[in-house]
Amino acid sequence: MKRKAYNIAPVTLRSMPFWCFSNPLSDPFGGPVLPKLDSLDAAKMLAQAAAEGLIEATSFHDDDLVPWDPEHLEDDLDPASETYKKLREIKKVLDKAGIQVNAATCSLHGNRIFRNGGLTNPDPKIRALARRKAERTLRIGNLFGAKYFIYWVARDGFEVPVAVDWKRVYGWLADGLNGAYDYIQKMGFKNYVGATVEPKPNEPRGHMFLPTAGHAVGFIYGHLKHPEFFGVNPELLQHEGMALMNSVETVGYLVSMKKLFFLHFGSQIKAQFDDDFPPLVGPEGLKETVQMFWALRQMGWKGVLEYDCHMLRADADPADPLGCRLQFIRDCVRATAIALLLADRLSGLKTNGLNAAETDLAATALMCQLDEKSIQEWMKN
Protein backbone atom coordinates (compact mmCIF):
# COMPACT_ATOMS: atom_id res chain seq x y z
CA MET A 1 0.00 0.00 0.00
CA LYS A 2 1.24 3.46 -0.89
CA ARG A 3 -0.61 6.45 0.49
CA LYS A 4 -1.80 9.08 -1.97
CA ALA A 5 0.44 12.16 -2.14
CA TYR A 6 -0.77 15.41 -0.60
CA ASN A 7 0.16 17.57 -3.61
CA ILE A 8 -1.06 21.00 -2.57
CA ALA A 9 1.65 23.26 -3.93
CA PRO A 10 4.38 23.54 -2.92
CA VAL A 11 3.93 20.53 -0.60
CA THR A 12 4.05 17.04 -2.12
CA LEU A 13 4.07 15.02 1.12
CA ARG A 14 3.62 15.85 4.81
CA SER A 15 6.14 14.03 6.98
CA MET A 16 5.88 13.65 10.77
CA PRO A 17 9.19 12.34 12.15
CA PHE A 18 9.41 10.03 15.15
CA TRP A 19 11.44 12.56 17.14
CA CYS A 20 8.75 15.26 17.01
CA PHE A 21 5.70 13.67 18.60
CA SER A 22 7.70 11.17 20.69
CA ASN A 23 9.48 14.01 22.51
CA PRO A 24 8.94 13.64 26.30
CA LEU A 25 9.38 17.43 26.64
CA SER A 26 12.19 17.76 29.13
CA ASP A 27 14.18 21.00 29.15
CA PRO A 28 17.26 22.38 30.96
CA PHE A 29 15.06 23.37 33.91
CA GLY A 30 12.92 20.27 34.31
CA GLY A 31 12.61 16.62 33.52
CA PRO A 32 10.26 14.92 31.07
CA VAL A 33 6.54 15.69 31.24
CA LEU A 34 5.44 12.70 29.17
CA PRO A 35 6.55 9.07 29.40
CA LYS A 36 8.96 7.76 26.80
CA LEU A 37 7.08 6.36 23.81
CA ASP A 38 8.22 2.97 22.58
CA SER A 39 9.18 3.13 18.92
CA LEU A 40 6.70 0.43 17.90
CA ASP A 41 3.90 2.31 19.66
CA ALA A 42 5.11 5.47 17.92
CA ALA A 43 4.83 3.71 14.56
CA LYS A 44 1.27 2.71 15.43
CA MET A 45 0.44 6.33 16.25
CA LEU A 46 1.81 7.38 12.87
CA ALA A 47 -0.41 4.75 11.27
CA GLN A 48 -3.40 6.26 13.07
CA ALA A 49 -2.45 9.74 11.88
CA ALA A 50 -2.12 8.46 8.32
CA ALA A 51 -5.53 6.79 8.57
CA GLU A 52 -6.97 10.19 9.53
CA GLY A 53 -5.43 11.64 6.36
CA LEU A 54 -2.97 13.81 8.29
CA ILE A 55 0.39 12.56 6.96
CA GLU A 56 1.93 10.56 4.17
CA ALA A 57 5.51 10.13 5.39
CA THR A 58 7.87 10.02 8.35
CA SER A 59 11.59 10.22 9.18
CA PHE A 60 13.72 9.07 12.08
CA HIS A 61 17.02 9.16 13.91
CA ASP A 62 18.53 5.72 14.30
CA ASP A 63 18.18 6.10 18.08
CA ASP A 64 14.46 6.87 17.72
CA LEU A 65 13.89 3.31 16.57
CA VAL A 66 16.44 1.16 18.39
CA PRO A 67 19.19 1.70 20.99
CA TRP A 68 22.82 1.97 19.90
CA ASP A 69 25.56 -0.06 21.53
CA PRO A 70 29.12 0.92 20.49
CA GLU A 71 30.19 -2.62 21.38
CA HIS A 72 27.82 -4.10 18.76
CA LEU A 73 28.07 -1.90 15.69
CA GLU A 74 26.36 -4.32 13.31
CA ASP A 75 23.48 -5.56 15.48
CA ASP A 76 21.09 -4.47 12.72
CA LEU A 77 22.52 -7.27 10.55
CA ASP A 78 22.10 -10.02 13.13
CA PRO A 79 18.73 -11.84 12.76
CA ALA A 80 19.00 -13.00 16.38
CA SER A 81 19.33 -9.46 17.79
CA GLU A 82 16.49 -7.45 19.31
CA THR A 83 17.50 -4.57 17.03
CA TYR A 84 16.98 -6.66 13.89
CA LYS A 85 13.57 -7.88 15.09
CA LYS A 86 12.34 -4.48 16.31
CA LEU A 87 13.23 -2.72 13.06
CA ARG A 88 11.19 -5.19 11.05
CA GLU A 89 8.21 -4.91 13.39
CA ILE A 90 8.23 -1.14 12.92
CA LYS A 91 8.62 -1.46 9.16
CA LYS A 92 5.63 -3.81 9.01
CA VAL A 93 3.42 -1.21 10.73
CA LEU A 94 4.57 1.63 8.47
CA ASP A 95 4.25 -0.45 5.31
CA LYS A 96 0.72 -1.56 6.20
CA ALA A 97 -0.26 2.08 6.76
CA GLY A 98 1.28 3.14 3.44
CA ILE A 99 3.66 5.57 5.15
CA GLN A 100 6.78 6.46 3.18
CA VAL A 101 10.10 7.20 4.87
CA ASN A 102 11.51 10.52 3.76
CA ALA A 103 14.83 10.47 5.60
CA ALA A 104 17.10 8.67 8.03
CA THR A 105 19.44 10.70 10.20
CA CYS A 106 22.20 9.54 12.50
CA SER A 107 22.05 10.75 16.08
CA LEU A 108 25.51 12.08 16.84
CA HIS A 109 24.34 14.29 19.69
CA GLY A 110 22.66 12.10 22.33
CA ASN A 111 25.46 9.82 23.47
CA ARG A 112 28.08 11.43 25.69
CA ILE A 113 30.80 9.82 23.57
CA PHE A 114 30.11 12.55 21.00
CA ARG A 115 30.07 15.46 23.47
CA ASN A 116 32.97 17.12 21.60
CA GLY A 117 31.63 16.32 18.16
CA GLY A 118 30.98 13.37 15.90
CA LEU A 119 32.41 13.69 12.40
CA THR A 120 34.58 16.63 13.51
CA ASN A 121 35.74 15.22 16.83
CA PRO A 122 39.51 15.84 17.25
CA ASP A 123 39.93 12.22 18.40
CA PRO A 124 40.30 10.02 15.28
CA LYS A 125 38.89 7.00 17.13
CA ILE A 126 35.67 8.86 17.90
CA ARG A 127 35.43 10.16 14.33
CA ALA A 128 35.76 6.57 13.12
CA LEU A 129 33.06 5.48 15.56
CA ALA A 130 30.77 8.26 14.31
CA ARG A 131 31.26 7.04 10.75
CA ARG A 132 30.42 3.48 11.76
CA LYS A 133 27.26 4.73 13.46
CA ALA A 134 26.35 6.67 10.31
CA GLU A 135 26.89 3.53 8.22
CA ARG A 136 24.52 1.62 10.51
CA THR A 137 21.98 4.39 10.05
CA LEU A 138 22.37 4.15 6.28
CA ARG A 139 21.66 0.43 6.49
CA ILE A 140 18.56 1.05 8.60
CA GLY A 141 17.44 3.73 6.16
CA ASN A 142 17.91 1.30 3.31
CA LEU A 143 15.69 -1.24 5.06
CA PHE A 144 12.93 1.37 5.32
CA GLY A 145 13.42 2.75 1.81
CA ALA A 146 14.44 6.22 3.01
CA LYS A 147 14.93 8.71 0.19
CA TYR A 148 17.48 10.89 1.98
CA PHE A 149 20.22 10.72 4.57
CA ILE A 150 20.32 13.82 6.80
CA TYR A 151 23.48 15.18 8.36
CA TRP A 152 22.33 17.49 11.16
CA VAL A 153 25.26 19.44 12.57
CA ALA A 154 24.50 18.04 16.06
CA ARG A 155 27.60 18.59 18.25
CA ASP A 156 29.97 19.41 15.40
CA GLY A 157 30.84 22.84 16.68
CA PHE A 158 32.79 24.68 19.36
CA GLU A 159 32.74 27.07 22.29
CA VAL A 160 36.40 28.12 22.25
CA PRO A 161 37.80 29.16 18.84
CA VAL A 162 41.42 28.69 19.88
CA ALA A 163 40.68 25.07 20.82
CA VAL A 164 39.76 24.19 17.20
CA ASP A 165 42.16 22.76 14.62
CA TRP A 166 40.97 25.08 11.86
CA LYS A 167 43.39 23.63 9.31
CA ARG A 168 41.77 20.22 9.49
CA VAL A 169 38.26 20.44 10.94
CA TYR A 170 36.41 20.97 7.64
CA GLY A 171 38.48 18.23 6.06
CA TRP A 172 37.34 15.86 8.80
CA LEU A 173 33.74 16.79 8.12
CA ALA A 174 34.22 16.29 4.39
CA ASP A 175 35.77 12.88 5.06
CA GLY A 176 32.69 11.89 7.04
CA LEU A 177 30.16 12.98 4.43
CA ASN A 178 32.19 11.73 1.48
CA GLY A 179 32.42 8.47 3.40
CA ALA A 180 28.63 8.31 3.68
CA TYR A 181 28.33 8.73 -0.10
CA ASP A 182 30.99 6.08 -0.70
CA TYR A 183 29.23 3.66 1.63
CA ILE A 184 25.92 4.10 -0.22
CA GLN A 185 27.68 3.28 -3.48
CA LYS A 186 29.66 0.39 -2.01
CA MET A 187 26.53 -1.24 -0.60
CA GLY A 188 24.51 -0.64 -3.76
CA PHE A 189 21.73 1.18 -1.91
CA LYS A 190 19.29 2.39 -4.58
CA ASN A 191 16.77 3.99 -2.23
CA TYR A 192 18.81 7.14 -1.58
CA VAL A 193 18.20 9.93 -4.08
CA GLY A 194 20.38 12.33 -2.09
CA ALA A 195 21.71 13.46 1.25
CA THR A 196 21.21 16.76 3.05
CA VAL A 197 22.96 19.07 5.46
CA GLU A 198 20.78 20.64 8.14
CA PRO A 199 22.60 23.76 9.37
CA LYS A 200 22.10 25.49 12.71
CA PRO A 201 23.85 28.58 14.14
CA ASN A 202 24.26 27.28 17.71
CA GLU A 203 22.86 24.84 20.27
CA PRO A 204 23.80 22.40 21.58
CA ARG A 205 27.27 23.89 20.94
CA GLY A 206 28.08 27.57 21.33
CA HIS A 207 28.78 27.80 17.59
CA MET A 208 28.34 25.30 14.78
CA PHE A 209 30.79 24.68 11.95
CA LEU A 210 27.93 24.99 9.42
CA PRO A 211 25.67 27.65 10.95
CA THR A 212 23.51 28.71 7.99
CA ALA A 213 22.16 27.51 4.66
CA GLY A 214 24.80 29.58 2.88
CA HIS A 215 27.60 27.92 4.82
CA ALA A 216 26.12 24.51 3.98
CA VAL A 217 25.94 25.20 0.24
CA GLY A 218 29.47 26.59 0.20
CA PHE A 219 30.75 23.52 2.03
CA ILE A 220 28.95 21.17 -0.37
CA TYR A 221 30.45 22.79 -3.45
CA GLY A 222 33.86 23.45 -1.92
CA HIS A 223 34.57 20.22 -0.05
CA LEU A 224 32.44 17.29 -1.21
CA LYS A 225 33.40 14.96 -4.06
CA HIS A 226 29.83 14.62 -5.33
CA PRO A 227 28.10 17.95 -4.69
CA GLU A 228 25.22 16.97 -6.98
CA PHE A 229 24.18 14.31 -4.42
CA PHE A 230 24.03 16.73 -1.49
CA GLY A 231 21.55 19.47 -0.71
CA VAL A 232 20.14 21.33 2.28
CA ASN A 233 17.07 20.83 4.43
CA PRO A 234 16.76 24.11 6.32
CA GLU A 235 14.71 24.13 9.52
CA LEU A 236 12.37 27.08 9.11
CA LEU A 237 11.47 29.25 10.80
CA GLN A 238 13.67 28.02 13.64
CA HIS A 239 17.33 27.69 12.74
CA GLU A 240 17.71 30.65 10.40
CA GLY A 241 15.52 32.74 12.72
CA MET A 242 17.88 32.05 15.62
CA ALA A 243 20.42 34.13 13.67
CA LEU A 244 17.89 36.85 12.74
CA MET A 245 17.64 35.72 9.12
CA ASN A 246 14.48 35.56 7.04
CA SER A 247 13.09 32.25 5.81
CA VAL A 248 11.91 33.70 2.50
CA GLU A 249 15.47 34.69 1.68
CA THR A 250 16.71 31.24 2.71
CA VAL A 251 14.36 29.30 0.43
CA GLY A 252 14.91 31.81 -2.37
CA TYR A 253 18.65 31.31 -2.21
CA LEU A 254 18.48 27.53 -1.93
CA VAL A 255 16.03 27.15 -4.81
CA SER A 256 18.23 29.38 -6.96
CA MET A 257 21.16 27.07 -6.17
CA LYS A 258 19.03 23.93 -6.75
CA LYS A 259 19.87 22.84 -3.21
CA LEU A 260 16.50 22.91 -1.41
CA PHE A 261 15.92 19.16 -1.22
CA PHE A 262 13.11 19.33 1.35
CA LEU A 263 11.94 21.54 4.19
CA HIS A 264 11.86 21.18 7.97
CA PHE A 265 9.00 23.22 9.40
CA GLY A 266 8.06 24.84 12.69
CA SER A 267 7.96 28.28 14.30
CA GLN A 268 10.36 30.48 16.23
CA ILE A 269 10.81 33.71 18.17
CA LYS A 270 13.74 35.38 16.44
CA ALA A 271 17.12 35.52 18.19
CA GLN A 272 16.06 33.04 20.86
CA PHE A 273 17.27 29.51 21.52
CA ASP A 274 15.68 26.85 19.30
CA ASP A 275 12.02 27.22 20.32
CA ASP A 276 10.79 24.41 18.06
CA PHE A 277 7.25 25.72 18.37
CA PRO A 278 4.60 24.00 16.25
CA PRO A 279 3.92 25.86 12.97
CA LEU A 280 2.14 29.23 13.39
CA VAL A 281 2.22 28.86 17.19
CA GLY A 282 3.75 31.67 19.21
CA PRO A 283 3.76 35.46 19.01
CA GLU A 284 5.48 35.92 15.64
CA GLY A 285 6.17 34.38 12.25
CA LEU A 286 2.75 34.40 10.56
CA LYS A 287 3.70 36.73 7.71
CA GLU A 288 7.10 35.11 7.26
CA THR A 289 5.59 31.62 7.05
CA VAL A 290 2.90 32.60 4.57
CA GLN A 291 5.34 34.55 2.42
CA MET A 292 7.74 31.59 2.47
CA PHE A 293 5.09 29.38 0.89
CA TRP A 294 4.15 32.18 -1.51
CA ALA A 295 7.80 32.44 -2.61
CA LEU A 296 8.13 28.68 -3.07
CA ARG A 297 5.07 28.71 -5.31
CA GLN A 298 6.38 31.70 -7.21
CA MET A 299 9.63 29.82 -7.91
CA GLY A 300 7.84 26.60 -8.84
CA TRP A 301 9.49 24.49 -6.13
CA LYS A 302 7.68 21.38 -4.92
CA GLY A 303 8.81 18.95 -2.26
CA VAL A 304 8.35 17.30 1.11
CA LEU A 305 7.29 19.38 4.10
CA GLU A 306 8.65 17.71 7.21
CA TYR A 307 7.68 18.89 10.67
CA ASP A 308 10.61 19.48 13.00
CA CYS A 309 9.13 20.79 16.22
CA HIS A 310 7.41 19.58 19.37
CA MET A 311 4.29 20.43 21.32
CA LEU A 312 4.46 23.20 23.88
CA ARG A 313 5.59 21.77 27.20
CA ALA A 314 2.60 23.45 28.86
CA ASP A 315 0.24 21.59 26.50
CA ALA A 316 1.49 18.13 27.44
CA ASP A 317 -1.01 16.01 29.36
CA PRO A 318 0.65 13.32 31.51
CA ALA A 319 -2.81 11.80 32.08
CA ASP A 320 -3.29 11.34 28.32
CA PRO A 321 0.17 11.02 26.76
CA LEU A 322 -1.10 9.39 23.57
CA GLY A 323 -4.04 11.74 23.09
CA CYS A 324 -2.01 14.92 23.49
CA ARG A 325 0.60 13.62 21.06
CA LEU A 326 -2.02 12.85 18.44
CA GLN A 327 -3.51 16.32 18.96
CA PHE A 328 -0.07 17.82 18.37
CA ILE A 329 0.09 16.05 14.99
CA ARG A 330 -3.37 17.39 14.13
CA ASP A 331 -2.30 20.91 15.14
CA CYS A 332 0.77 20.79 12.89
CA VAL A 333 -1.30 19.68 9.91
CA ARG A 334 -3.99 22.27 10.63
CA ALA A 335 -1.35 25.00 10.76
CA THR A 336 0.00 23.85 7.39
CA ALA A 337 -3.46 24.07 5.84
CA ILE A 338 -3.93 27.58 7.28
CA ALA A 339 -0.56 28.76 5.97
CA LEU A 340 -1.18 27.35 2.49
CA LEU A 341 -4.65 28.88 2.33
CA LEU A 342 -3.25 32.26 3.34
CA ALA A 343 -0.48 31.92 0.75
CA ASP A 344 -3.20 31.26 -1.83
CA ARG A 345 -4.61 34.71 -1.15
CA LEU A 346 -1.29 36.33 -2.06
CA SER A 347 -1.49 34.91 -5.57
CA GLY A 348 -3.57 37.94 -6.53
CA LEU A 349 -1.04 40.48 -5.23
CA LYS A 350 -0.53 43.39 -7.64
CA THR A 351 2.55 45.53 -7.04
CA ASN A 352 2.53 47.88 -10.04
CA GLY A 353 3.26 51.42 -8.95
CA LEU A 354 3.60 50.53 -5.26
CA ASN A 355 6.68 51.15 -3.16
CA ALA A 356 7.98 48.48 -0.78
CA ALA A 357 5.95 49.64 2.23
CA GLU A 358 2.77 49.91 0.17
CA THR A 359 3.39 46.44 -1.26
CA ASP A 360 3.80 44.96 2.21
CA LEU A 361 0.59 46.57 3.46
CA ALA A 362 -1.26 45.44 0.34
CA ALA A 363 -0.03 41.88 0.86
CA THR A 364 -1.09 41.94 4.52
CA ALA A 365 -4.54 43.26 3.64
CA LEU A 366 -4.90 40.64 0.91
CA MET A 367 -3.80 37.85 3.25
CA CYS A 368 -6.38 38.99 5.82
CA GLN A 369 -9.05 39.54 3.14
CA LEU A 370 -9.54 43.18 4.06
CA ASP A 371 -11.11 45.25 1.31
CA GLU A 372 -9.93 48.78 0.57
CA LYS A 373 -13.30 50.34 1.35
CA SER A 374 -13.31 48.96 4.89
CA ILE A 375 -9.72 50.05 5.45
CA GLN A 376 -10.51 53.59 4.30
CA GLU A 377 -13.54 53.78 6.60
CA TRP A 378 -11.47 52.76 9.60
CA MET A 379 -8.79 55.28 8.67
CA LYS A 380 -11.37 58.06 8.95
CA ASN A 381 -13.05 56.97 12.21
Each predicted region: which residue ranges?
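An active-site-proximal structural segment forming one wall of the substrate-binding cleft
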Residues: 90-93, 122-149, 168-188
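Active-site-proximal loop/turn and secondary-structure-junction residues that shape catalytic pockets
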Residues: 20-22, 62-66, 105-110, 153-157, ...
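Glycine-rich, aromatic-flanked loop segments that form ligand/cofactor-binding clefts
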Residues: 3, 9-17, 46-68, 77-111, ...
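Active-site-proximal loop/short-helix segments
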Residues: 106-117, 146-168, 190-207, 211
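Histidine-acidic metal/acid-base catalytic patches
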Residues: 1-54, 139, 162, 175-185, ...
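Surface-exposed, active-site-proximal loop segments in enzymatic domains
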Residues: 24-31, 65-84, 110-128, 155-168, ...
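Conserved beta-strand positions in the central sheet of alpha/beta enzyme cores
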Residues: 57-59, 103, 150, 264, ...
